[in-house]
């Protein structure tokens, strides 16, 4: 995987989280065309950039607990 592909995955993940439309980790993996394990690595990438992320079990989506603006 190239660095550009890595950044694109993070950016797409951010958009799904921002709009609260991620679905489950399995669904998200399919939407991003990556493995479930990579979903968790990309979530960690965002968290390492300062994002506070939680999973809402009722709505079945990841969301930001505080406003977050991704700047790459």
Predicted regions and their residues:
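Extreme N-terminal segment that seeds HTH/winged-HTH DNA-binding domains in transcriptional regulators
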Residues: 1-23
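Alpha-helical residues within the helix-turn-helix
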Residues: 30, 47
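Minor-groove-contacting beta-hairpin "wing" of winged helix-turn-helix DNA-binding domains
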Residues: 53-66
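Conserved segment of winged-helix/HTH DNA-binding domains
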Residues: 67-72
């Amino acid at each position: 995987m190239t660095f550009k592909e890595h950044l694109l995955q993070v950016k797409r993940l951010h958009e799904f989280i921002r709009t609260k439309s991620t679905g489950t980790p399995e669904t998200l993996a399919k939407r991003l065309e990556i493995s479930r394990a990579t979903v968790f690595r990309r979530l960690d990438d965002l968290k390492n950039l300062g994002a506070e992320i939680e999973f809402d079990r009722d709505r079945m989506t990841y969301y930001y607990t505080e406003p977050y603006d991704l700047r790459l």
